[in-house]
């Protein structure tokens, strides 16, 4: 099942921005609000798994409840209907920027003052979420973005959980949730966590952006988790000279093993960071320098100059004897010899007795590369990672192994882990100006297979030609993605607006507001006042292409409407006609007998009543005899 390119007839998916363990994030266009958004879609292969489905829904609920400038906003959620069932998605604010992980990988450590500013803003975001009863549980550099205007944005509440839910069975299991290098000790032990766990993880992030590497590094996630629980971190200043002792103190307090010894809230950590930023001493305990440690451990001065140093006698308990000391030493030697003999015998059996013990290669398909490596190394195999494109398996997850799962190998032999880099990528060619058929062929030649045409208004010259593509030309995209080919449909149709009764200039403005800019003024014979618009061609209300030339019909003011003169005497009819502006001549028709009208009254007239007549036109009247 593949991800549809259109969701709910509103969101058009574009290029993939990134992948997570259970989702993929697309740049998308909100067709209703005409803005770019980021759309996170649950991986199609996980949509049918109730646990992943509920976890994804929980992320949407958690993030939607958090409205803060330093937290990526959630605009909408929904489910797309697919042949295999509903596919949930989350519509989020699109942040045009880079993650802290990318910054450190590309540019190395961040200057301490800037690092303090970034983490202080992240503290605000986390403190806001904690106040609303939600802990993040996966704070790491990849989940903190810096936008192009330097705004800090915390994102991905994918494994966040409401504090009110922390007593349920999911949280209490021994399953470790989060990323190994940023786990709090209580997370690593599978214990219930609270907001102080996020403080620890944020301390790990601060450590990494100051020094260029996380506080603990190991060959496997298990090894790193062990260090979080058991080992103290090296002060950041020993790895990067620009870190001050005051900043050391803040980092190490955030990284305290016991949650009670850490900052109790993200707000407390932010307050100490601001103090350090302003050149003040933090509330965190001071971290001693090497010189200060040496000074404290130096021997006190002798009571008097030149006094000889003597070994102090060691008191021994009653009954202690030299014979007992000797027997203990012999016992320790015997244990050591036995351990060495065990190793020698084991090696001899393997060398003389035949092949080493065979071990079955476990199935690690669709696990993360780190988890797969740990599983294989725990079986005694050496591992090497080979990254390759795959159209089915999401990036960062294992395609398979070589030898394949189920094979039996000798312990210590090498297994190649094939890790997906995602679908094969290709550069979208520029097909603007081509016909749709030509564009499809050019896109096929570039490696793409799925296409969809979308009409869009254009100039007459662009009608039937490609205007653009989505993804855009010269961008890389997965070859399995559908390419939208935007084809010119010619000028957009619009109704002609009415401007009757206006003057010509006002009419032009009204038509331009409706999208019609090509107009011509035509004077016509009409009874209306001179200069008054009496209509348009095409007539108002008609829908026509916006590039249509609209005739604005303006009255010459040279006509009047012929009145009904039948039954009137000429002495009455003449004043009526002149009052209407008539300046023409009377054409007297033949008299009419037996008309029923009074003698000399008008019996017939031409033009007939109600007809527009030029003011200088000839009028024919017949009178009763």
UniProtKB/Swiss-Prot annotation:
Catalytic site positions: 138
Membrane spanning residue stretches: 332-352
Keywords assigned: ATP-binding, Cell membrane, Kinase, Magnesium, Membrane, Metal-binding, Nucleotide-binding, Phosphoprotein, Repeat, Serine/threonine-protein kinase, Transferase, Transmembrane, Transmembrane helix
EC number: 2.7.11.1
The keyword Membrane appears for this protein: yes
Membrane topology, Extracellular segments: 353-625
Activation and inhibition: By K-252a.
Domain of life assignment: Bacteria
InterPro entries recorded: Kinase-like_dom_sf, PASTA_dom, Prot_kinase_dom, Protein_kinase_ATP_BS, Ser/Thr_kinase_AS
Binding annotation for ATP: 17-25, 40, 93-95, 140-143, 156
Membrane topology, record value: Single-pass membrane protein
PROSITE patterns per record: PASTA, PROTEIN_KINASE_ATP, PROTEIN_KINASE_DOM, PROTEIN_KINASE_ST
Annotated function: Protein kinase that regulates many aspects of mycobacterial physiology. Is a key component of a signal transduction pathway that regulates cell growth, cell shape and cell division via phosphorylation of target proteins. Probably phosphorylates RseA.
Domain comment as written in the entry: The PASTA domains interact with peptidoglycans and are required for PknB localization.
NCBIfam families: PknB_PASTA_kin
Protein name: Serine/threonine-protein kinase PknB
């Amino acid at each position: 099942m593949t991800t549809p390119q259109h969701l709910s007839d509103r969101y058009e998916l574009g290029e993939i921005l990134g992948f997570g363990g259970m989702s993929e994030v697309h740049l998308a266009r909100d067709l209703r609000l005409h803005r770019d958004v980021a759309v996170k879609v649950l991986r199609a292969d996980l949509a049918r798994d109730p646990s992943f489905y509920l976890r994804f829904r929980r992320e949407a609920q958690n993030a939607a409840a958090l409205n803060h400038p330093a937290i990526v906003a959630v605009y909408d959620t929904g489910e797309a209907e697919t042949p295999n069932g509903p596919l949930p998605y989350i519509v989020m604010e699109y942040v045009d920027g880079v993650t802290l992980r990318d910054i450190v990988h590309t540019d190395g450590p961040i200057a301490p003052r800037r690092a303090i500013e970034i983490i202080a803003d992240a503290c605000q975001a986390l403190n806001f979420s904690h106040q609303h009863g939600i802990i993040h549980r996966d704070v790491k550099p990849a989940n903190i973005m810096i936008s192009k205007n330097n705004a800090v944005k915390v994102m991905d509440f994918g494994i966040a959980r409401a504090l009110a839910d922390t007593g349920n069975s999911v949280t209490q299991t021994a399953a470790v949730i989060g990323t190994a290098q940023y786990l709090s000790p209580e997370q690593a032990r599978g214990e219930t966590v609270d907001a102080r766990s996020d403080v620890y993880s944020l301390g790990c992030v601060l450590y990494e952006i100051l020094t260029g590497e996380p506080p603990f590094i190991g060959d496997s996630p298990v090894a790193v988790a062990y260090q979080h629980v058991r080992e103290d971190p090296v002060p950041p200043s020993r790895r990067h000279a620009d870190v001050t002792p005051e900043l050391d103190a803040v980092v190490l307090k955030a990284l305290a093993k016991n949650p009670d010894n850490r900052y109790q809230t993200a707000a407390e950590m932010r307050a100490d960071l601001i103090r350090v930023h302003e050149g003040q001493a933090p509330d965190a305990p001071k971290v001693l320098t090497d010189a200060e440690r040496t000074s404290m451990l130096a021997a006190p001065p002798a009571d008097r100059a030149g006094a000889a140093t003597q070994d102090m006698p060691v008191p021994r308990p009653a009954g202690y004897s030299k014979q007992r000391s000797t027997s203990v030493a012999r016992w320790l030697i015997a244990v050591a010899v036995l351990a060495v003999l065990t190793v020698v015998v084991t090696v001899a059996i393997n060398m003389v007795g035949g092949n080493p013990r065979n071990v079955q290669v476990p199935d690690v398909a669709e696990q993360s590369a780190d988890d797969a490596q740990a599983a294989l190394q725990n079986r005694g195999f050496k591992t090497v990672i080979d990254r390759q494109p795959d159209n089915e398996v999401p990036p960062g997850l294992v395609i398979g192994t070589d030898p394949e799962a189920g094979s039996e190998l000798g312990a210590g032999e090498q297994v190649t882990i094939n890790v997906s880099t995602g679908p094969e990528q290709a550069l979208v060619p520029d097909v603007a100006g081509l016909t749709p058929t030509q564009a499809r062929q050019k896109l096929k030649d570039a490696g793409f297979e799925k296409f969809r045409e979308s009409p869009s208004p254009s100039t007459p010259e662009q009608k039937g030609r490609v205007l653009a593509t989505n993804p855009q030309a010269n961008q890389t995209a997965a070859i399995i993605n559908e390419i939208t080919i935007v084809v010119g449909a010619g000028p957009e149709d619009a109704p002609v607006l009415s401007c009757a009764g206006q003057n010509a200039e006002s009419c032009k403005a009204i038509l331009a507001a409706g999208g019609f800019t090509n107009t011509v003024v035509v004077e016509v014979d009409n009874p209306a006042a001179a200069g008054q618009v009496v209509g348009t061609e095409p007539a108002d209300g008609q829908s026509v292409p916006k590039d249509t030339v609209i005739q604005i019909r303006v009255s010459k003011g040279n006509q009047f409407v012929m009145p009904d003169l039948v039954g009137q005497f000429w002495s009455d009819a003449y004043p009526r006609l002149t009052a209407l502006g008539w300046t023409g001549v009377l054409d007297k028709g033949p008299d009419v007998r037996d008309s029923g009208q009074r003698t000399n009254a008008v019996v017939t007239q031409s033009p007939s009543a109600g007809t527009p007549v030029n003011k200088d036109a000839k009028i024919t009247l017949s009178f009763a005899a």
